[in-house]
Amino acid sequence: RDAQESRGLGDVYKRQELCQLAVELTGDAPAVLDNGCGEGYYTAGIYRALCEAGKTPVMAGIDISKPILRLAAKQEKNVQFAVASSYRLPAADRSVDLLINCFSPLAIEEFRRVLRPGGHFIYVVPGEMHLWEMKQVLYDHPYVNEVKETPYEGFRYVSIRHITDVIHLEDPADIQALFGMTPYCWKTPKAGVEKLCKLTQLDCRIAFDIHVFEKER
């Protein structure tokens, strides 16, 4: 499985969980906002899952990149997309039933503003052991990602779901491609990068945590 396919596997798992949660957490006609939607992969999947569940969603996705949003618009023509910042969401006060935040800035005050009382936001972050085997190669003293149930003012913590798998990279180019998709490529010591470049294959865990919060009524 190459780096793109391996990353895609994690994306599929995340989308399945996000779709299931969206159906569970919303009513018959939910207003849904995907913050930092990127190319719209999750946005389109969630919209279709809601429709297949017999709901009539109104859905929008925002991102700061106009070129990326052009790609997103091709994913699902019934979703509205707009260029906007996480810190200035183009939504009215108390107008959103469900907000998705997948690896995007946590603008908690804006989330609290746009969500209706009893509405939910889903927050996706790297799991405790995400890319652990790669980090063991890159660093002399690798660290485990901190996983915690963080309280946010005005919200009730509902649940957490863990997604884990192992990816198998059998080509040095795929290892480097995966490394280039991570923040580690900007802050790894030269010695660690050189060690990674010498690898011909790598089995590496991927792990994601999906946190659910409810706005207090």
PLM regions with names:
Residues 39-54:
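Conserved SAM-binding loop of SAM-dependent methyltransferases across substrates and taxa
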Residues 65:
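Conserved SAM/SAH-binding beta-strand->alpha-helix loop
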Residues 118-126:
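Conserved beta-strand signature within the Rossmann-like core of class I S-adenosyl-L-methionine
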